[in-house]
């Protein structure tokens, strides 16, 4: 399991792993400092951080979870993890919140077209554990782009501008001849596709 940093990986997954495996006969040893478990079948479960990519080299892997992949450097997958999985034809699961149209977006699109891969998209708005009222409060108080990215798992080009799209009003009728003032928002830029 790889998170953006070792501490994040440990904070997110370590206690959950210990709870899931507690009381089973699967664990041979547990090492708190390195967040590693050795299983009775000889396999290891280790938590790592992608912020120190060289610590990921030289370790045999059968399966890896890359959490918050959009926050990782693409080289972590392409130059370190992917080659390491090759000798055992290992697998990988990429999870996280989109962060614009970066390498996570590219991988998501490629996986939709490749029969050896699968793409999934789950939104917070569909999560039964999140109160719909909280979702509506977030929708009202966040920018459209931030809400779409954080709650709807949309690959939006988030610019962090201060104006919500729905606040902008316009008229379909062309104006008459005359002098006009045009306001420009220098707070952000979003590409139009």
Short names for language-model regions:
Residues 44, 61-63, 88-94:
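Loop/turn-to-beta-strand initiation segments
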